């Protein structure tokens, strides 16, 4: 038995639950990060957006918090809804892409101009 077959045999019992573990961890992470920004509007984010000259910072900050909770919920609930769940999961994933692109651009833009990007977990967070 070669190593590939051996690893396949070890992983086989977990094939059914692996996507659920990923859904639960990623979805819960976004729900908690969004919930941590309540009550709306999140004052720290509003101040950061104001300092960057963003129009309507209180509205945008509130939309980010609600979007994080909604996206995390969609990622988790998408696994429960059968065929419709694929659409729900993709919509939640699309919201995550928009939110995280904005987060990297607005809050973590220094990550892209430093060697620290490749020497810590930041590159993996960006890849997510």
Describe every region a protein language model picked out.
Residues 1-39, 58-73, 77-128:
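Extended, low-polarity transmembrane helix blocks
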Residues 39-56:
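Membrane-interface interhelical connector segments
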């Amino acid at each position: 038995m070669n190593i590939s077959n051996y690893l396949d045999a070890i992983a086989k019992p977990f094939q059914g639950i692996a996507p659920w573990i990923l859904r639960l961890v990623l979805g819960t992470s976004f729900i908690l990060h969004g919930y941590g920004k309540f009550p709306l509007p999140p004052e720290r984010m509003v101040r950061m957006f104001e300092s960057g000259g963003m129009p309507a910072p209180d509205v945008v900050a509130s939309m980010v918090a609600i979007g994080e909770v909604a996206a995390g919920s969609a990622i988790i609930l998408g696994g429960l809804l059968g065929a419709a769940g694929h659409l729900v999961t993709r919509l939640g994933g699309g919201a995550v892409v928009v939110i995280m692109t904005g987060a990297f651009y607005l809050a973590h833009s220094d990550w892209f101009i430093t060697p620290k990007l490749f020497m810590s977990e930041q590159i993996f967070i960006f890849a997510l």
